[in-house]
Amino acid sequence: MNNYTKDDDGRLNNFAVEPKIYAADAPSKADKRNYLIMAAITVVLVAGLIAVAVVASGAST
């Protein structure tokens, strides 16, 4: 793939070449399940971090 184009007179055009656009595939049932599992793990981790922060801030006073 060239990083340039030429016009009808043969002059170089240094503008970016636009990539071909395509539609993404819809996520499968397995993908959706994996996203749900990752979201649940993330919620648990963030809740744990917040709990540790609350306990640590209360313990220092």
Curated annotation (Swiss-Prot):
InterPro entries: Psb34-like. It comes from the Bacteria. It is a single-pass membrane protein. Induction: Expressed under normal light (40 umol photons/m(2)/s); less is made under high light (500 umol photons/m(2)/s), which disappears after 2 hours (at protein level). Its main location: membrane. Disruption phenotype: Normal growth, photosystem ratio and O(2) evolution under all tested light regimes. Greatly increased levels of HliA and HliB are detected in monomeric PSII in normal light (40 umol photons/m(2)/s). High levels of HliA and HliB are visible at all times during growth in high light (500 umol photons/m(2)/s). A double hliA-psb34 deletion has high levels of HliB even at 24 hours, grows very poorly under intermittant light (5 minutes 500 umol photons/m(2)/s and 5 minutes dark for 8 days). One of its GO terms (cellular component) is photosystem II. One of its GO terms (biological process) is photosystem II assembly. Keywords: Membrane, Photosynthesis, Photosystem II, Thylakoid, Transmembrane, Transmembrane helix. It is found in: Cellular thylakoid membrane. The chain crosses the membrane at residues 36-56. Involved in photosystem II (PSII) assembly and/or repair. Probably involved in conversion of late PSII assembly intermediates into mature dimeric PSII, it may mediate the optimal equlibrium of HliA/HliB among the intermediates containing CP47 (psbB) to facilitate photoprotection during assembly. Belongs to the Psb34 family. Part of the photosystem II (PSII) assembly intermediate RC47 complex (with D1, D2, CP47, PsbE, PsbF, PsbH, Psb27 and Psb28); minor amounts are found in other PSII complexes, including mature, dimeric PSII with PsbO and PsbV. No HliA or HliB are detected in any of these complexes. Its interaction with PSII requires both CP47 (psbB) and PsbH. HliA/HliB and Psb34 probably bind to a similar site on CP47; their binding seems to be mutually exclusive. This is Photosystem II assembly protein Psb34. The gene is psb34.
